[in-house]
């Protein structure tokens, strides 16, 4: 009777602790994850490019795929500022451009000739900027097109012109592509002469030593011992993990000890049966030769 009551109590305690484990363990897993969203709504190709750059620079980053086909880049919260600076220096994420279909989509209203002309010039600028941005080593590009409204009755026409601004990696030999870039712009705009296209190249150079120094500075600032809530959470998570481990170990050892104590108590309560005889009866084959 005593052994049965003891077993019921142990079973009740164990079943009562199970809900606590189911709540504590997921909470600890959630707290141990300190990654935050860096950029969202990214296309897969651009997200992979950003992920590779971050990982090559020593940043622990992951890409999370969304249900809508876009991707999200997540990094450690301590390296959020460094990750933003690193990607901005490489022109990532890239600027989004509108195409001709998006600019001239039906609005239901009759546009004036001036509005249609403005849309056309803007569409040319967007398309050319997008094309030049796809060149390897180009971080960002802007194309400004000037199409003067010439009067057919006036003799002297003002020629069209275009200005191109390119921000690129200094390691890329982009000046060698300058004639091709000017030809690309001139051939894309009707009536635009080659010598009326001006291109401004701005190289961006950052030495490897400066890059490592910036990373070391951000890591030092992120890991310095300051009494911030984030540090308190990290210490609390570590303490909670240690406490839960000890708690589970204590439960296992205590349960085993209570089983052995119950077996010994039941053996001692049996009248006329020695402990050795009970053990031999409990384990068949013991003492047989």
Curated annotation (Swiss-Prot):
Transmembrane regions listed in the UniProt entry: 233-253
Annotated membrane topology: Lipid-anchor
GO biological processes: protein secretion
Lipidation (S-diacylglycerol cysteine): 34
Keyword list, A-Z: Cell outer membrane, Lipoprotein, Membrane, Nodulation, Palmitate, Plasmid, Signal, Transmembrane, Transmembrane helix
Stored InterPro entries: AMP-bd_C_sf, FliF_N_dom, T3SS_SctJ, YscJ/FliF
Chief location: membrane
Cellular component terms per the entry's GO annotation: cell outer membrane
Compartment(s): Cell outer membrane
NCBIfam families on file: III_secr_YscJ
Name of the protein: Nodulation protein NolT
Organism phylogeny: Bacteria, Pseudomonadati, Pseudomonadota, Alphaproteobacteria, Hyphomicrobiales
Gene: nolT
């Amino acid at each position: 009777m005593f052994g049965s009551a003891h077993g019921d109590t142990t079973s009740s305690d164990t079943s009562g602790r199970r809900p606590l484990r189911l709540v504590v363990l997921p909470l600890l897993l959630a707290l141990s994850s300190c990654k935050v969203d860096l950029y969202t709504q990214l296309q897969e190709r651009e997200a992979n490019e950003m992920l590779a750059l971050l990982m090559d620079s020593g940043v622990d980053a992951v890409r999370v795929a969304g249900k809508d086909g876009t991707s999200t880049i997540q990094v450690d919260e301590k390296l959020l500022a460094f990750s933003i600076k690193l990607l901005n220096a490489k022109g990532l994420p890239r600027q989004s451009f509108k195409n001709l279909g998006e600019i001239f989509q039906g609005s239901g209203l009759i546009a004036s000739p001036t509005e249609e002309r403005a849309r056309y010039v803007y569409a040319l600028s967007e398309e050319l900027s997008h094309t030049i941005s796809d060149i390897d080593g180009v971080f960002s590009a802007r194309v400004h097109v000037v199409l003067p409204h010439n009067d057919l009755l006036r003799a002297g026409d003002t020629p069209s012109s275009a200005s191109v601004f390119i921000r690129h990696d200094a390691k890329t030999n982009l000046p060698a592509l300058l004639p091709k870039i000017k030809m690309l712009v001139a051939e894309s705009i009707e009536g635009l002469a080659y010598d009326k296209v001006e291109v401004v190249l701005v190289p961006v150079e950052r030495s490897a030593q400066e890059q490592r120094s910036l990373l070391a500075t951000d890591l030092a600032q992120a890991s310095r011992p300051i009494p911030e809530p984030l540090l308190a959470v990290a210490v609390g998570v570590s303490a909670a993990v240690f406490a839960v481990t000890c708690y589970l170990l204590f439960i296992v050892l205590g349960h085993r000890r209570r089983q052995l104590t119950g077996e010994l108590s039941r053996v001692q309560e049996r009248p006329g049966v020695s402990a050795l005889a009970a053990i031999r009866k409990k384990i068949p084959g013991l003492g047989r030769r």
